Regions:
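Alpha/beta-hydrolase fold active-site neighborhood
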Residues: 239-365
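N-terminal cap/lid subdomain of alpha/beta-hydrolase-fold enzymes
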Residues: 64, 70-147, 358-380, 387-390, ...
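A catalytic-pocket lid/entrance helix-loop region that shapes and gates access to the active site
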Residues: 187-249
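Catalytic-loop region of hydrolases
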Residues: 2-7, 25-119, 425-430, 434-477
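Conserved acidic catalytic loop of the alpha/beta-hydrolase fold
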Residues: 148-163
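Short glycine-enriched nucleophile-adjacent loop
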Residues: 174-185, 191
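Alpha/beta-hydrolase fold nucleophile elbow
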Residues: 161-171
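Active-site-adjacent alpha-helix of alpha/beta-hydrolase-fold enzymes
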Residues: 379, 385-423
Length: 477
């Protein structure tokens, strides 16, 4: 469902590859050698070792943890859930990172981990391979079961990492961190959720229509809509190229039904995907309606991605689309400028991206429950959004006395789906950074006195703290 849905790993939240180690805060270093951290972790029942990747300043382990398929009935069997451990020191705070998708097995650091100069545990979401039960009972893929995975891993690791813990994630990972907090509110000392959509009522999506009527400037909106329409006017010519590309590259369309249906989805993604990953300043790259078909084809592929709705492009994200069609909900929006050019009403929905042998039925109420909890009962929650990110059109809402409960929500002006605390205006950036430090229990005296003194405890590392968003095709958060 549009490249945008993709955003829900897309973000996944700007994690990169570890380079040189950062300076430690205080005397703590990665040298926890007595006993060896790997040995300590592997003594935990259910843990198994996959690999270790050496790098300066940390220990980095890829591990599996045995989890119940059904936390309500553990006797029904288990599966191996993959996670990674970026170990700095046991006397530092720990950040529990989730992308909501597959886990990146290269060393990486989320923004809160850099802020607190701590350890990071990154967990793969259940049913994303290889963390999928065999055979897969898809009815056991829901937000409570996934939150229970996190809770159980946290309980296993807490005796080793006994300082404060924070949960974080971007997009679907931000949703995941929020759901974890809703079901297990006392596990974490704080939560930082980036660009996390909140689809409270699945059939009420007028917020997206309002968003696309006002995002950016009028000239850019008009040009994007015109090019999107032109892509359908030239459908037959471009689909012919698309089919040849698919044949040459071994791509198939069994799930969506045909190359023509896949192409309609790709085009419907176009405007959403542009704003998800680009800025107002990128509007100059949008071609005119008189552009050559070669240029138009290239633009569509760069923004939406022709592989997105092939069987091969969809397969990895089947668990996401299953959840979108059974519990999370998925955005819809009107496209009056495409009137008369769309051939497949209703095709732009999660059910059409999941193999038909997997049953799906939408269950109302889950998102409303989380929304109510955030507004009424949550504590120490920080939501960070980008003003120009379509996924921010339906954000989590804060209730009464939010600041007294240390709940905050900030929007970065002009920000997209890669927005971070560092992108906020100065006073909000300082406030957010100070709160994260306090929640982690590592706020220096100067920060306790004045939020304006707050800054990350670890220096920026260009490989470890990569700024760019990991992009994915299709409408995913």
């Amino acid at each position: 469902m549009r490249k945008a849905l993709r955003a829900l790993l897309a973000l996944t939240m700007s994690i990169g590859t570890v380079g040189a180690g950062s300076a430690a805060a205080g005397a703590a270093t990665a040298a926890d050698t007595a006993p060896d951290i790997k040995e300590r972790i592997l003594k935990i029942p259910g843990m198994s070792f996959v690999e270790e990747k050496p790098y300066e300043g940390y220990r980095y382990l890829v591990l599996n943890y045995k989890q119940p398929i059904d936390h309500k009935n553990p006797a029904k069997g288990t599966f191996e859930q993959r996670f990674t451990l970026l170990h700095k020191a046991t006397d530092r705070p720990t950040v529990f990172f989730t992308s909501g998708y597959n886990v990146n097995t290269n060393p990486s650091r989320s923004e809160p981990t850099r802020i607190v100069d701590g350890n990071q545990v990154s967990m793969e979401y259940r049913y994303f391979t290889p963390s999928r039960p065999k055979p897969a009972d898809w009815s056991k893929l829901d937000i409570w079961q996934a939150a229970s995975d996190q809770h159980r891993l946290f309980q296993a690791l807490k005796p080793v990492y006994n300082k404060n813990w924070l949960a974080t994630g971007g997009s679907k990972g931000g949703m995941t961190a929020t759901y974890f907090r809703r079901f297990y509110p006392n596990d974490m000392n704080g939560t930082v959720a980036y660009v996390a959509p909140n689809d409270v009522v699945n059939n009420e999506d007028s917020a997206y229509d309002r968003f696309f009527a006002s995002v950016g400037d009028q000239a850019c909106r008009t040009q994007l809509n015109s090019v999107q329409r032109e892509a359908l006017v030239r459908r037959d010519e471009i689909v012919g190229r698309y089919q040849k590309w698919a044949k040459d590259n071994g791509k198939t369309f069994k799930v969506v039904g045909s190359a023509d249906k896949a192409y309609e989805n790709v085009v419907l993604d176009l405007v959403w995907a542009f704003w998800q990953y680009h800025l107002q300043s990128d509007c100059k790259t949008v071609p005119s309606t008189k552009a050559s078909t070669d240029d138009l084809y290239k633009f569509i592929d760069e923004i939406s991605g022709f592989e997105a709705y092939t069987d091969q492009g969809l397969e990895q994200y089947t668990p996401y689309y299953y959840q979108a069609g059974t519990e999370l909900g998925a955005p819809t929006f009107k496209s009056p400028h495409l009137k008369g050019l769309l051939r497949y009403p209703g095709i732009y929905s999660p059910r059409n991206y999941v193999p038909r042998d997997i049953p799906m039925k939408f269950r109302n109420g889950s998102m409303a429950d989380v929304d109510r909890w955030v507004r009424e009962d949550s504590k120490r929650m920080l939501f960070v959004y980008g003003q120009n990110d379509p996924w921010s059109a339906e954000p989590f809402r804060l209730g009464r006395n939010a600041e007294a409960r240390h709940d905050y929500r900030f929007f970065a002006p002009g920000g997209n789906h890669g927005t971070k605390i560092a992108d906020l205006v100065a006073d909000e950036r300082a406030k957010a950074t100070a709160e994260v430090l306090r929640w982690a229990g590592v706020a220096p005296a100067a920060v306790q006195k004045d939020d304006r003194n707050a800054k990350p405890l670890a220096p920026f590392n260009s490989k470890l703290d990569r700024k760019d968003v990991e992009r994915n095709t299709m409408l995913r958060p």
